[in-house]
Design a protein with these regions (language model features):
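Short, structured interface segments
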Residues: 1, 149-157, 224-236
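Iron-sulfur-cluster electron-transfer modules
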Residues: 1-102, 108-123
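Short glycine-rich loop/turn motifs
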Residues: 34, 165-167, 229-230
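Helix-rich terminal scaffold detector
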Residues: 74, 152, 246-249
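Hydrophobic alpha-helical positions that pack around
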Residues: 76-189, 195-200, 211
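Short, catalytically relevant binding-site loops at active-site mouths
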Residues: 188-189, 212-216, 239-240
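Ubiquitin-like/PB1-type beta-grasp interaction modules and other compact soluble beta-rich domains
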Residues: 199-232
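Ferredoxin-like iron-sulfur electron-transfer modules
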Residues: 232-249
Length: 249
């Protein structure tokens, strides 16, 4: 369809880490009957707050993007929030009411725990449906998308803007002032410091692209922001379990 083509041309992918093309996810095989589009707003990864900040600052963009996806899929929309972000529920519900989408989508609070945001957990928590081993959410009639992805779809349709920038969290005990930044995709992390964030002197012993549970350890800051980079975490020695190396024999 033209809508899926627009998403494809905008280069929109899953922004929660997997970077799976959004136009493919929104066009499942004909034998998959999609009943729900589930926006994974749990953000259970420690240190990361980029989705929370996005929902707080631009709730209208999330609701608009979800409405577009629902029109494409013909499904019902659910936004899943962890209950430590319960203050956002009335904010999003007000926007849903304002836009006239109360029959099309709702906001559900789920328990704050890790790994609440994983696909099978979030589907089970929201819908009471178990996804069998080896199966995908689409097999259970569900499409799961990330907050950033849904907002990027809104930008593509309303502004004609491709996915050329993203927001990410800079956090961890080694960061002087943890923050969320919006930067062009491809920006080197080393180019962001010290102008946009600074580290406590000689305190960062571990640099992670992403969060501490699902992220990847990096040797230094000479790597770029990708479409799936949700944050950069700088950990101190107290926050990591590092043991002294010794001879293995």
């Amino acid at each position: 369809t033209a809508a899926l083509d627009r998403i494809k041309q905008a280069g929109i992918v899953g922004m929660g880490g997997a970077s799976f093309p959004a136009h493919v996810k929104l066009n499942p095989p004909e034998d998959k009957d999609i009943e729900y589009v589930l926006v994974n707003a749990a953000e259970c990864e420690p240190y990361l707050t980029v989705d929370e900040r996005t929902m707080k600052e631009t709730p209208e963009k999330l609701i608009d993007g979800l409405a577009i996806v629902l029109k494409i899929s013909g499904a019902y929309g659910i936004i899943a929030l962890e209950d430590n972000k319960a203050y956002l529920k009335p904010v999003l519900e007000e926007q849903i009411l304002k836009c006239g989408y109360t029959d099309d989508m709702e906001v559900i609070l789920v328990k704050t725990k890790y790994p609440q945001g994983s696909e099978k957990f979030i589907v089970s928590s929201c819908l009471g449906v178990e996804i069998p081993s080896g199966k995908l959410p689409a097999d259970a009639g569900v499409i799961i998308s990330n907050v950033g992805t849904i907002c990027a779809i809104s930008d593509a349709f309303r502004l004609g803007k491709p996915l050329i920038e993203r927001s990410l969290t800079i956090s961890g005990g080694a960061v002087e002032t943890p923050c969320n930044l919006k930067v062009p995709v491809g920006t080197m992390i080393s180019d962001l410091s010290p102008e946009y964030f600074s580290l406590k002197e000689n305190s960062a012993v571990k640099i992670i692209s992403g969060g501490p549970m699902m992220g990847f350890a990096m040797p230094d800051m000479n790597f770029p922001v990708a479409k799936g980079t949700s944050g950069i975490t700088f950990l101190t020695k107290d926050e990591t379990y590092l043991v002294d190396e010794d001879q293995c024999i």
